[in-house]
């Protein structure tokens, strides 16, 4: 997933502290869990709180981040807006996705019932310019139907069942499903994207390409906490962008 550009700054040079490789006794080696926590602290210190997922503000007509405020999404409408944003951000820059989201928000189309009530062709016209707009319009219609089906009971559903439900929607893959679960529905699941794979390779020499292997690596070595997962994922993307990785 591609995200909005932020102001540039010096990228932290994360030192390698593989205890055994550096000559330390094995019992003093830095564990994966400890290293992940240390890197997280260094990234927060360098880049600050990220405040994902940005949400549309009616007054300013801009997408606003909310660093340090983990009460978002505050309602079903904001949760749905994030779901829409996840779909729009597939395979395009965040700038393109943001423009399409604004085009939906301005005439108040950014609503589950409204989207459910218009045709795929009409929806495609609103998001034209976002890339793959016809395909995404069909996905948006399908994921909207799924959301309307689940919105009254998703809080009681297990992460696995909820994930499977969104994966059943054509056009929703693992990265998109996990983005929906983590940011829209506040479920503790770690998102794996290309930046995360490069992060694992650079800092842990972990080169697995399998999505779930990478997700297991992160989840097994971090406290299973929604806030931590949200911030860490956003920070990894910021790290990748600053390093041009």
Question: Language-model segments: what does each one mean?
Answer:
Residues 1-156, 224-228, 232-245:
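N-terminal polyanion-binding entry modules of DNA glycosylases/AP lyases
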Residues 22, 65, 172, 215-219:
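Short amphipathic alpha-helical surface micro-motifs
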Residues 80, 119, 136, 158-162, ...:
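Short, conserved alpha-helical segments within structured domains
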Residues 85-88, 140, 144, 157-206, ...:
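Catalytic DNA-binding helix-loop module of base-excision-repair DNA glycosylases/AP lyases
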Residues 96-110, 153-162, 194-200, 210-218:
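Short alpha-helical "patches" and their helix-cap loops
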Residues 102, 125, 136, 148, ...:
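Alpha-helix boundary/interfacial micro-motifs
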Residues 115-119, 123-124, 162, 166, ...:
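Short, well-structured alpha-helical segments that form the helix of a local strand-helix-strand
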Residues 196-245:
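Hydrophobic secondary-structure block in the mid-to-C-terminal portion of proteins
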